Amino acid sequence: MSRVRKSIRFITLFTLALPLFAQTAKRRFTIDDIYDRAKRIPAAAMEPRTFTWADDTHFYFPRTGAAGEVTSFVLVDAVTGAQTALFDPDELEAQVSKVEGVSTDEAKKFSRPRSITADWGARDVLLSIHDDLFIYRIASKSLTRLTSTPGKEEEATFSPDGRLVAFVRDNNLYTIDIVSKAERQRTTDGTKKIMNGLFDWVYQEEIYGRGIFKSYWWSPDSRSIAYLQIDDTHVPEFTVVDHLPVHQKLEVTPYPKSGDPNPAATLHVADLSTGNSIRLDRIADPAAMLIVDVAWRPDSSAVAFQVQDREQTYLDLDEVSRSGGDIHPVLHETTKAWVDNEGSPFYLKDKSFLWLSEHTGWKHIYRVEADGKQRPLTMGQWEVRKLFGIDEKNDWVYYSAAERDPIGLDVYRMHLDGSGKQLLTERAGTHEATFNAALTRFVDNWSDVATPPQISIVDAAGKPGKMIRDSNSGHELEQFDINKPELVHVPTRDGFVMEAEIIRPPNFDPTKKYPIYEHTYSGPHAPQVRNAWGGSTYLFHQMLAQNGVVVWICDNRTASGKGAQSAWPLYKNFGELELRDLEDGLAWISSQPGIDGSRALLNGWSFGGFMTTYALTHSTKWSAGIAGGPVTDWHDYDSVYTERYMLTPEHNKDGYVRTSPTQAAANLQAHLLLLHGAIDDNVHVQNTVQFVYALQKAGKQFEMMLYPKSRHGVTDPDLVKQLHTLAFGFVMRNLKP
């Protein structure tokens, strides 16, 4: 009798507890949760990363929809935190629909651009509609046509005083008065191969930044425009083929591969009052040099420009008057290997300036006097990441640095003599700051390895203001069975301390044996272990862990971001040192309880794809690999990036052979999945085709998937979902967790 009562009591208690279990049960991620355009959770979507100050108290950012498309721009009052629409897309659409020749679908697209160019105060916005320029005046909700020509107007910007708009048409530089609509052509020698005010492919990709094609700079007084002329006459062309149309679409682009003739860049200035344009530099052989930075002095009296040799073994900072004349050499930098361009000088009223340099092996801030004498304002075995600006009136310099943690990022300020340093961001993690022009406040985009971004306003003294956005305010991640990443330090065989991250499966049992999925990039100054939110990649890693795989990320020294001194050892020899460090990292994680090092898969894209193919043809430590968009022979990649680290093939013939996965294809022992965008204009699919042919000739088996309409990154949401479904299946088949 008593046994029956006990059983009934247990059943009753268990039944009562069921709702509690139902509420607290955690579930696994699915591919749809992360990559399906309609079903993915908000934490998997791209967060706004671009914040633009309209004035010193307002900024705006793009708001995106479920598929990542921009739906509107949000204007934020930095004092009150109030958010409103910068403009109503529907109202703009109504105006655009009145433009002759614009369809209903086009009106919707043109009124919701991915990015905008606005004047100071964000009163007027420039729009490109059917390759002509229009101004949308936000206050009056009126749309005004500026140009009406067969040619396409590109890279349009407002002058600092807001009176003019500059743009490039048919590779010539123009200006137009926004009131009178009077147009002036500022250059006349533009051709298909000679570009005024526009970068070619390699200059935007490797020197000024991916997606930055504008190669002109307004003087602060709006009276002149400095610009680069890029001459691609002798640069070999590469053809990218789109195979989807019945008749192939050919895209021909000047693309200098390592050792090829480079673009010839020259510096000019257009005087808007006289209409004259003169050349400023005195470079004897422009194709042998690179102009890597251009900036105006604040008083518009002179242009500062930085020049490097093509192998980037040195850097010269020079100045020249806006009216031309003699070149004034300011400083000359060299290092033990290559010299990275660290941006423009920040000028003070006494003609001195602040300058970022890593010539000691660590990037720090220097004050450079007019005579070229330098003294450091920051010192130590840590890196300054960015110099935001100088508040000379209040004696403050604002910058970001990885001083507290090499995998984090903080914002600091100090006095102009280097004293009085203050940490402005107390919370550990990564703080990406966007300052207003007055340096009185900044947008703080904070996250850590387990927390999605939180966007807030912080004043110049570090006092937190309004929270603008909390990406996990709905606590959506709490429904998932997530194991917080563990950040660890791993010694190499020669004592370098590598940063690493482990994500173990939930309910990890050290008496069992779990396989390893290792993610890498490995390229110079490109750490993957960061105390920052990893977005959809992080959620995919959690999904792997939930399915019984240990996720392992270990930054080899050259990728660590721990100063140039940690990257220089790879000079002239991609792959060898990186592989040694990755092997040391794999040995360390394999020695931990519950880890089966015999089942290890290496994954990477771009340089990470190179590293995966290199590792799998030069080592037997990994049983499988996924290589996306890989460089498989450095003869095939662009001159500026490759020669910075490897020199030219003429100067490093053996190095190019030694570092080629294609040359070593016969050594492949692991299971390999190759992925590549079919119209990749960066790392050409030629790399994968050459590697595939070498594998076939050697009798090697492998798997491959091409992505039509995809460039170096696969961005079509449907293809992204297919790619990760494929990758997940490959991991499960080969690691057998």
Feature roles, as predicted:
Residues 1-6:
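N-terminal secretory signal peptides that target proteins for export/translocation
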Residues 8, 40, 204-206, 645, ...:
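Hydrophobic alpha-helical segments, principally membrane-spanning helices and signal/leader peptides
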Residues 9, 362, 415, 527-529, ...:
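Intrinsically disordered, low-complexity peptide-like regions
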Residues 9-19:
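Bacterial N-terminal signal peptides
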Residues 22-435, 440-453, 457-460, 477:
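Beta-propeller folds
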Residues 236-238, 292, 300, 306, ...:
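Serine-hydrolase catalytic core recognition
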